From Swiss-Prot:
Family: Belongs to the class-II aminoacyl-tRNA synthetase family.
Protein name as it appears in the record: Histidine--tRNA ligase
Pfam families linked: HGTP_anticodon, tRNA-synt_His
Compartments (UniProt record): Cytoplasm
Species assigned in the record: Acaryochloris marina (strain MBIC 11017)
Disulfide-bonded cysteines: none
Top EC category: ligase
EC identifiers of the protein: 6.1.1.21
High-level lineage: Bacteria, Bacillati, Cyanobacteriota, Cyanophyceae, Acaryochloridales
GO molecular function terms listed in the Swiss-Prot or TrEMBL record: ATP binding; histidine-tRNA ligase activity
Subunit: Homodimer.
Catalytic activity: tRNA(His) + L-histidine + ATP = L-histidyl-tRNA(His) + AMP + diphosphate + H(+)
Length: 430
Protein backbone atom coordinates (compact mmCIF):
# COMPACT_ATOMS: atom_id res chain seq x y z
CA UNK A 1 0.00 0.00 0.00
CA UNK A 2 1.21 3.50 -0.83
CA UNK A 3 1.62 6.19 1.78
CA UNK A 4 -1.19 8.64 2.46
CA UNK A 5 -0.56 12.16 1.21
CA UNK A 6 -1.77 15.48 2.55
CA UNK A 7 -5.15 16.59 1.17
CA UNK A 8 -5.15 18.97 -1.79
CA UNK A 9 -5.22 22.57 -0.62
CA UNK A 10 -3.58 21.80 2.71
CA UNK A 11 0.08 21.55 3.62
CA UNK A 12 2.42 20.60 6.42
CA UNK A 13 4.26 23.45 8.11
CA UNK A 14 7.69 22.03 8.86
CA UNK A 15 9.98 23.15 11.71
CA UNK A 16 12.21 25.40 9.56
CA UNK A 17 9.09 27.34 8.50
CA UNK A 18 7.35 27.23 11.87
CA UNK A 19 9.83 29.77 13.24
CA UNK A 20 8.30 32.35 10.85
CA UNK A 21 4.83 31.51 12.15
CA UNK A 22 6.00 31.83 15.74
CA UNK A 23 7.63 35.16 14.92
CA UNK A 24 4.40 36.55 13.41
CA UNK A 25 2.24 35.14 16.22
CA UNK A 26 4.48 36.47 19.00
CA UNK A 27 4.77 39.91 17.41
CA UNK A 28 1.01 40.15 16.92
CA UNK A 29 0.26 38.89 20.42
CA UNK A 30 2.50 41.50 22.03
CA UNK A 31 1.22 44.36 19.88
CA UNK A 32 -2.45 43.50 20.43
CA UNK A 33 -1.89 43.21 24.18
CA UNK A 34 -0.38 46.70 24.13
CA UNK A 35 -3.49 47.95 22.30
CA UNK A 36 -5.79 46.40 24.97
CA UNK A 37 -7.25 43.73 22.66
CA UNK A 38 -8.19 40.45 24.35
CA UNK A 39 -7.92 37.06 22.67
CA UNK A 40 -11.13 35.19 21.80
CA UNK A 41 -11.17 31.51 20.80
CA UNK A 42 -14.21 30.19 18.95
CA UNK A 43 -14.98 26.75 17.40
CA UNK A 44 -13.67 25.99 13.93
CA UNK A 45 -17.13 24.82 12.89
CA UNK A 46 -20.47 26.58 13.34
CA UNK A 47 -24.06 26.15 12.25
CA UNK A 48 -24.25 26.85 8.52
CA UNK A 49 -26.93 29.50 8.84
CA UNK A 50 -24.52 31.69 10.82
CA UNK A 51 -22.49 32.24 7.66
CA UNK A 52 -25.49 32.35 5.34
CA UNK A 53 -27.02 35.14 7.42
CA UNK A 54 -23.76 36.84 8.38
CA UNK A 55 -21.70 36.75 5.19
CA UNK A 56 -24.60 36.77 2.71
CA UNK A 57 -26.06 33.98 0.59
CA UNK A 58 -25.24 35.88 -2.62
CA UNK A 59 -21.50 35.95 -1.89
CA UNK A 60 -19.00 33.61 -3.54
CA UNK A 61 -17.88 32.46 -0.10
CA UNK A 62 -21.31 31.08 0.80
CA UNK A 63 -22.33 30.06 -2.71
CA UNK A 64 -19.15 28.31 -3.86
CA UNK A 65 -16.45 28.03 -1.22
CA UNK A 66 -17.79 26.73 2.10
CA UNK A 67 -17.07 23.27 3.49
CA UNK A 68 -20.56 22.24 4.61
CA UNK A 69 -21.76 18.84 5.79
CA UNK A 70 -24.55 17.15 7.74
CA UNK A 71 -23.42 15.81 11.10
CA UNK A 72 -24.74 12.62 12.73
CA UNK A 73 -27.61 14.60 14.20
CA UNK A 74 -28.60 15.76 10.69
CA UNK A 75 -27.52 19.33 11.48
CA UNK A 76 -25.93 21.46 8.76
CA UNK A 77 -22.41 22.34 9.91
CA UNK A 78 -19.78 24.49 8.17
CA UNK A 79 -16.05 24.81 8.76
CA UNK A 80 -15.53 28.51 9.34
CA UNK A 81 -14.52 30.38 6.15
CA UNK A 82 -13.68 33.56 8.10
CA UNK A 83 -13.54 34.73 11.70
CA UNK A 84 -15.84 37.71 12.10
CA UNK A 85 -19.18 35.87 12.03
CA UNK A 86 -18.07 33.48 14.77
CA UNK A 87 -16.69 36.33 16.87
CA UNK A 88 -19.98 38.21 16.57
CA UNK A 89 -21.97 35.07 17.43
CA UNK A 90 -19.84 34.67 20.56
CA UNK A 91 -20.24 38.37 21.41
CA UNK A 92 -24.04 37.97 21.28
CA UNK A 93 -24.35 34.54 22.89
CA UNK A 94 -22.08 35.38 25.82
CA UNK A 95 -23.62 38.84 26.29
CA UNK A 96 -20.29 40.65 26.02
CA UNK A 97 -22.28 43.72 25.02
CA UNK A 98 -23.64 43.85 28.59
CA UNK A 99 -20.15 44.71 29.84
CA UNK A 100 -20.49 48.12 28.22
CA UNK A 101 -17.86 50.16 26.43
CA UNK A 102 -15.92 48.90 23.43
CA UNK A 103 -15.11 45.19 23.30
CA UNK A 104 -11.68 44.87 21.69
CA UNK A 105 -11.19 41.25 20.63
CA UNK A 106 -8.69 39.36 18.53
CA UNK A 107 -8.41 35.79 17.27
CA UNK A 108 -6.00 33.50 15.49
CA UNK A 109 -6.62 30.17 13.81
CA UNK A 110 -7.40 28.11 10.71
CA UNK A 111 -10.15 28.96 8.21
CA UNK A 112 -11.46 26.82 5.35
CA UNK A 113 -12.57 27.67 1.80
CA UNK A 114 -12.84 25.48 -1.28
CA UNK A 115 -10.62 27.52 -3.61
CA UNK A 116 -8.10 26.71 -6.30
CA UNK A 117 -4.83 26.22 -4.38
CA UNK A 118 -1.83 28.33 -5.25
CA UNK A 119 1.08 30.24 -3.73
CA UNK A 120 -0.26 31.97 -0.63
CA UNK A 121 -3.74 30.49 -1.12
CA UNK A 122 -4.78 27.22 0.50
CA UNK A 123 -8.08 25.53 1.31
CA UNK A 124 -7.04 25.50 4.94
CA UNK A 125 -5.49 28.86 5.70
CA UNK A 126 -4.80 30.87 8.83
CA UNK A 127 -5.81 34.34 9.91
CA UNK A 128 -5.13 36.80 12.67
CA UNK A 129 -8.11 39.10 13.11
CA UNK A 130 -9.25 41.97 15.31
CA UNK A 131 -12.78 43.18 16.08
CA UNK A 132 -13.67 46.41 17.91
CA UNK A 133 -17.35 46.19 18.84
CA UNK A 134 -19.36 49.03 20.34
CA UNK A 135 -18.14 52.25 18.73
CA UNK A 136 -19.24 54.07 15.60
CA UNK A 137 -16.58 56.73 16.16
CA UNK A 138 -14.23 57.14 13.17
CA UNK A 139 -11.38 56.85 15.66
CA UNK A 140 -12.18 53.13 15.95
CA UNK A 141 -11.68 52.77 12.19
CA UNK A 142 -8.39 54.65 12.41
CA UNK A 143 -7.28 52.61 15.43
CA UNK A 144 -7.68 49.21 13.79
CA UNK A 145 -6.00 50.43 10.60
CA UNK A 146 -3.12 51.85 12.65
CA UNK A 147 -2.70 48.52 14.46
CA UNK A 148 -2.49 46.64 11.15
CA UNK A 149 0.04 49.17 9.87
CA UNK A 150 2.11 48.87 13.04
CA UNK A 151 2.06 45.06 12.84
CA UNK A 152 3.38 45.07 9.28
CA UNK A 153 6.10 47.55 10.26
CA UNK A 154 7.04 45.54 13.36
CA UNK A 155 7.44 42.41 11.25
CA UNK A 156 9.76 44.24 8.86
CA UNK A 157 7.38 43.92 5.91
CA UNK A 158 8.57 46.20 3.09
CA UNK A 159 6.60 47.98 0.37
CA UNK A 160 2.91 47.84 1.26
CA UNK A 161 0.04 50.04 0.13
CA UNK A 162 -3.16 50.88 2.02
CA UNK A 163 -6.26 51.19 -0.17
CA UNK A 164 -9.32 52.89 1.28
CA UNK A 165 -12.98 53.22 0.32
CA UNK A 166 -16.39 53.81 1.87
CA UNK A 167 -19.48 51.72 1.16
CA UNK A 168 -21.71 54.09 3.11
CA UNK A 169 -24.95 52.99 4.74
CA UNK A 170 -27.30 50.31 3.44
CA UNK A 171 -29.36 53.09 1.84
CA UNK A 172 -26.30 54.65 0.17
CA UNK A 173 -25.26 51.24 -1.08
CA UNK A 174 -28.68 50.47 -2.56
CA UNK A 175 -28.71 53.74 -4.53
CA UNK A 176 -25.25 53.00 -5.82
CA UNK A 177 -26.18 49.41 -6.65
CA UNK A 178 -29.00 50.60 -8.90
CA UNK A 179 -26.72 53.05 -10.72
CA UNK A 180 -24.01 50.41 -11.10
CA UNK A 181 -26.39 47.81 -12.54
CA UNK A 182 -27.72 50.37 -15.03
CA UNK A 183 -24.19 51.16 -16.17
CA UNK A 184 -22.90 47.58 -16.33
CA UNK A 185 -25.99 46.28 -18.14
CA UNK A 186 -24.84 48.20 -21.21
CA UNK A 187 -21.75 45.97 -21.33
CA UNK A 188 -23.27 42.69 -20.17
CA UNK A 189 -22.05 40.70 -23.16
CA UNK A 190 -18.50 42.03 -22.68
CA UNK A 191 -18.26 41.01 -19.04
CA UNK A 192 -16.56 37.76 -18.04
CA UNK A 193 -18.93 34.86 -17.17
CA UNK A 194 -18.56 35.27 -13.40
CA UNK A 195 -19.37 38.97 -13.64
CA UNK A 196 -22.39 38.30 -15.84
CA UNK A 197 -23.65 35.97 -13.12
CA UNK A 198 -23.03 38.61 -10.46
CA UNK A 199 -24.79 41.43 -12.33
CA UNK A 200 -28.10 40.93 -10.54
CA UNK A 201 -26.94 38.78 -7.64
CA UNK A 202 -23.98 40.77 -6.28
CA UNK A 203 -23.01 43.55 -8.74
CA UNK A 204 -20.54 45.36 -6.47
CA UNK A 205 -18.23 42.33 -6.66
CA UNK A 206 -17.80 43.02 -10.38
CA UNK A 207 -15.70 46.04 -9.41
CA UNK A 208 -13.19 43.61 -7.89
CA UNK A 209 -12.93 41.38 -10.98
CA UNK A 210 -9.45 40.33 -12.11
CA UNK A 211 -10.59 39.84 -15.72
CA UNK A 212 -8.79 42.49 -17.88
CA UNK A 213 -11.82 43.41 -20.01
CA UNK A 214 -14.13 43.62 -17.00
CA UNK A 215 -11.57 45.70 -15.09
CA UNK A 216 -11.44 48.14 -18.00
CA UNK A 217 -15.25 48.47 -17.98
CA UNK A 218 -15.29 48.90 -14.20
CA UNK A 219 -12.82 51.78 -14.36
CA UNK A 220 -15.52 53.99 -15.92
CA UNK A 221 -18.31 52.83 -13.61
CA UNK A 222 -20.09 55.30 -11.32
CA UNK A 223 -18.01 56.22 -8.27
CA UNK A 224 -19.52 54.97 -5.02
CA UNK A 225 -18.14 57.99 -3.16
CA UNK A 226 -20.53 60.18 -5.18
CA UNK A 227 -23.47 58.30 -3.64
CA UNK A 228 -22.58 58.76 0.02
CA UNK A 229 -25.08 60.59 2.21
CA UNK A 230 -24.02 63.53 4.37
CA UNK A 231 -23.35 61.43 7.49
CA UNK A 232 -21.44 58.80 5.54
CA UNK A 233 -19.29 61.43 3.86
CA UNK A 234 -18.51 63.12 7.18
CA UNK A 235 -17.54 59.76 8.69
CA UNK A 236 -15.23 58.91 5.80
CA UNK A 237 -13.67 62.39 5.73
CA UNK A 238 -12.91 62.06 9.44
CA UNK A 239 -11.29 58.64 8.96
CA UNK A 240 -9.06 60.06 6.24
CA UNK A 241 -8.06 63.02 8.40
CA UNK A 242 -7.20 60.75 11.33
CA UNK A 243 -5.02 58.55 9.12
CA UNK A 244 -3.24 61.66 7.86
CA UNK A 245 -2.70 62.76 11.47
CA UNK A 246 -1.23 59.32 12.20
CA UNK A 247 1.10 59.67 9.20
CA UNK A 248 -0.40 56.59 7.56
CA UNK A 249 -0.33 56.95 3.78
CA UNK A 250 -3.30 55.65 1.79
CA UNK A 251 -4.88 55.82 -1.63
CA UNK A 252 -8.59 56.01 -2.41
CA UNK A 253 -9.92 53.09 -4.42
CA UNK A 254 -13.65 53.35 -5.25
CA UNK A 255 -13.53 49.81 -6.70
CA UNK A 256 -12.61 48.32 -3.32
CA UNK A 257 -15.76 46.58 -2.10
CA UNK A 258 -14.55 43.47 -0.20
CA UNK A 259 -16.20 40.10 -0.74
CA UNK A 260 -18.58 39.91 2.19
CA UNK A 261 -22.02 41.49 2.43
CA UNK A 262 -21.77 42.74 5.99
CA UNK A 263 -19.47 45.72 5.32
CA UNK A 264 -20.72 49.31 5.70
CA UNK A 265 -18.86 52.64 5.63
CA UNK A 266 -15.07 52.17 5.74
CA UNK A 267 -13.46 49.35 3.76
CA UNK A 268 -9.71 48.90 3.41
CA UNK A 269 -6.98 46.56 2.21
CA UNK A 270 -3.23 46.36 2.69
CA UNK A 271 -1.52 45.15 -0.47
CA UNK A 272 2.06 43.90 -0.65
CA UNK A 273 4.57 44.02 -3.46
CA UNK A 274 5.86 40.71 -4.79
CA UNK A 275 2.82 38.45 -4.29
CA UNK A 276 1.16 38.81 -7.71
CA UNK A 277 -2.59 38.14 -7.65
CA UNK A 278 -2.37 37.32 -3.94
CA UNK A 279 -1.21 40.83 -3.05
CA UNK A 280 -3.91 41.55 -0.45
CA UNK A 281 -2.53 40.45 2.91
CA UNK A 282 -4.95 42.29 5.19
CA UNK A 283 -8.52 43.39 4.61
CA UNK A 284 -11.31 44.73 6.72
CA UNK A 285 -13.81 47.44 7.38
CA UNK A 286 -16.83 48.52 9.34
CA UNK A 287 -19.88 46.29 9.85
CA UNK A 288 -22.45 48.26 11.82
CA UNK A 289 -25.44 46.01 11.02
CA UNK A 290 -24.01 42.53 11.49
CA UNK A 291 -24.59 42.17 15.23
CA UNK A 292 -28.28 43.07 14.95
CA UNK A 293 -28.74 40.91 11.85
CA UNK A 294 -27.46 37.93 13.85
CA UNK A 295 -29.92 38.57 16.67
CA UNK A 296 -27.98 40.90 18.95
CA UNK A 297 -28.51 44.52 19.90
CA UNK A 298 -27.57 47.24 17.43
CA UNK A 299 -23.80 47.43 17.80
CA UNK A 300 -21.42 49.29 15.48
CA UNK A 301 -18.17 47.45 14.86
CA UNK A 302 -15.01 47.48 12.77
CA UNK A 303 -12.21 44.97 12.24
CA UNK A 304 -9.76 43.25 9.93
CA UNK A 305 -8.08 39.91 9.22
CA UNK A 306 -4.55 39.18 8.06
CA UNK A 307 -3.77 36.13 5.93
CA UNK A 308 -0.80 34.48 7.60
CA UNK A 309 0.27 32.30 4.67
CA UNK A 310 0.67 35.30 2.38
CA UNK A 311 2.46 37.30 5.04
CA UNK A 312 4.91 34.51 5.81
CA UNK A 313 5.51 33.89 2.10
CA UNK A 314 6.52 37.53 1.78
CA UNK A 315 8.84 37.33 4.80
CA UNK A 316 10.54 34.31 3.25
CA UNK A 317 10.78 35.94 -0.19
CA UNK A 318 12.29 39.04 1.42
CA UNK A 319 14.93 36.74 2.94
CA UNK A 320 14.20 37.97 6.45
CA UNK A 321 16.39 35.68 8.54
CA UNK A 322 15.12 34.26 11.80
CA UNK A 323 17.33 32.25 14.10
CA UNK A 324 15.90 29.75 16.55
CA UNK A 325 19.12 29.44 18.50
CA UNK A 326 19.82 26.45 20.72
CA UNK A 327 21.82 27.10 23.87
CA UNK A 328 23.51 23.72 24.36
CA UNK A 329 24.05 20.48 22.44
CA UNK A 330 25.09 17.62 24.72
CA UNK A 331 27.19 14.65 23.59
CA UNK A 332 28.09 11.64 25.75
CA UNK A 333 29.69 8.19 25.42
CA UNK A 334 29.42 5.36 27.90
CA UNK A 335 26.54 4.27 30.15
CA UNK A 336 27.51 6.35 33.19
CA UNK A 337 28.35 9.45 31.14
CA UNK A 338 25.05 9.17 29.27
CA UNK A 339 23.10 8.88 32.54
CA UNK A 340 24.88 11.93 33.98
CA UNK A 341 24.31 13.86 30.74
CA UNK A 342 20.58 13.19 30.96
CA UNK A 343 20.49 14.69 34.46
CA UNK A 344 22.60 17.71 33.43
CA UNK A 345 20.36 18.44 30.45
CA UNK A 346 17.23 18.28 32.57
CA UNK A 347 18.71 20.57 35.22
CA UNK A 348 19.69 23.13 32.59
CA UNK A 349 16.21 23.04 31.04
CA UNK A 350 14.67 23.59 34.47
CA UNK A 351 16.86 26.71 34.73
CA UNK A 352 15.56 28.12 31.47
CA UNK A 353 18.15 26.93 28.94
CA UNK A 354 17.40 25.14 25.68
CA UNK A 355 19.30 21.87 25.40
CA UNK A 356 19.39 19.06 22.84
CA UNK A 357 20.93 15.75 23.86
CA UNK A 358 22.44 13.47 21.25
CA UNK A 359 20.72 10.08 21.54
CA UNK A 360 22.51 8.33 18.69
CA UNK A 361 25.10 6.46 20.77
CA UNK A 362 27.58 6.97 17.93
CA UNK A 363 31.26 7.89 18.21
CA UNK A 364 32.26 11.28 19.63
CA UNK A 365 33.41 12.48 16.22
CA UNK A 366 29.99 11.98 14.64
CA UNK A 367 28.22 13.47 17.64
CA UNK A 368 30.44 16.57 17.54
CA UNK A 369 29.72 17.03 13.83
CA UNK A 370 26.01 17.04 14.64
CA UNK A 371 26.68 19.56 17.41
CA UNK A 372 28.35 21.89 14.91
CA UNK A 373 25.38 21.57 12.53
CA UNK A 374 22.78 22.03 15.28
CA UNK A 375 23.09 25.79 15.55
CA UNK A 376 23.85 25.49 19.26
CA UNK A 377 26.01 28.11 20.92
CA UNK A 378 27.90 25.63 23.08
CA UNK A 379 28.50 21.90 23.36
CA UNK A 380 28.55 19.87 26.57
CA UNK A 381 30.86 16.84 26.35
CA UNK A 382 30.91 13.88 28.73
CA UNK A 383 33.03 10.75 28.39
CA UNK A 384 34.35 8.16 30.82
CA UNK A 385 36.86 10.62 32.32
CA UNK A 386 34.21 13.29 32.94
CA UNK A 387 31.82 10.69 34.36
CA UNK A 388 34.48 9.51 36.81
CA UNK A 389 35.50 13.07 37.79
CA UNK A 390 31.92 14.40 37.80
CA UNK A 391 32.95 17.15 35.38
CA UNK A 392 31.77 18.29 31.96
CA UNK A 393 33.64 19.83 29.04
CA UNK A 394 32.00 23.08 27.89
CA UNK A 395 32.97 24.02 24.32
CA UNK A 396 31.90 27.31 22.73
CA UNK A 397 31.31 26.31 19.13
CA UNK A 398 31.95 29.64 17.42
CA UNK A 399 35.35 30.28 19.01
CA UNK A 400 36.41 26.72 19.81
CA UNK A 401 37.19 27.78 23.39
CA UNK A 402 36.81 24.87 25.81
CA UNK A 403 36.83 24.58 29.60
CA UNK A 404 36.25 21.89 32.20
CA UNK A 405 33.55 22.58 34.79
CA UNK A 406 32.47 20.53 37.79
CA UNK A 407 28.94 19.25 37.29
CA UNK A 408 27.93 20.56 40.72
CA UNK A 409 29.21 24.02 39.79
CA UNK A 410 27.39 23.97 36.46
CA UNK A 411 24.08 23.93 38.30
CA UNK A 412 25.10 27.06 40.21
CA UNK A 413 26.42 29.04 37.24
CA UNK A 414 23.08 29.99 35.71
CA UNK A 415 23.69 33.75 35.59
CA UNK A 416 27.28 33.37 34.35
CA UNK A 417 26.21 30.91 31.66
CA UNK A 418 23.41 33.23 30.60
CA UNK A 419 25.88 36.11 30.22
CA UNK A 420 28.23 33.98 28.16
CA UNK A 421 25.38 32.72 25.98
CA UNK A 422 24.24 36.30 25.35
CA UNK A 423 27.76 37.23 24.29
CA UNK A 424 27.98 34.16 22.08
CA UNK A 425 24.68 35.05 20.40
CA UNK A 426 26.04 38.50 19.65
CA UNK A 427 29.21 37.07 18.15
CA UNK A 428 27.33 34.52 16.03
CA UNK A 429 25.04 37.17 14.51
CA UNK A 430 27.89 39.45 13.38
Amino acid sequence: MGFIQVSRGTRDILPDEVIYWQYVEATARQLLHQAAYRELRTPIFEQTNLFERGIGEATDVVGKEMYTFQDRGDRSITLRPEGTAGAVRSFIENKLHAQGGVQRLWYIGPMFRYERPGAGRQRQFHQIGVEALGSQDPRADAEVIAIASQLLKSLGVPDWTLSLNSLGTAEDRQKYREALVTYLSQYKDDLDPDSQDRLQRNPLRILDSKDPKTKEIAQSAPNILDYLGTDSKQHFDRVQQLLTDLDIAYKLNPCLVRGLDYYTHTAFEFELEGLGNQATVCGGGRYDRLVSELGGPETPAVGWAIGMERLILLLQNAEITLNQSLDFYCVARGPEAEAQALLICQNLRENGFSVEMDLSGSAFGKQLKRANRSGALACLILGDTEACDRTVQLKWLASGEQESIAQADLRNLTSQLQSKLTAAKGNSST
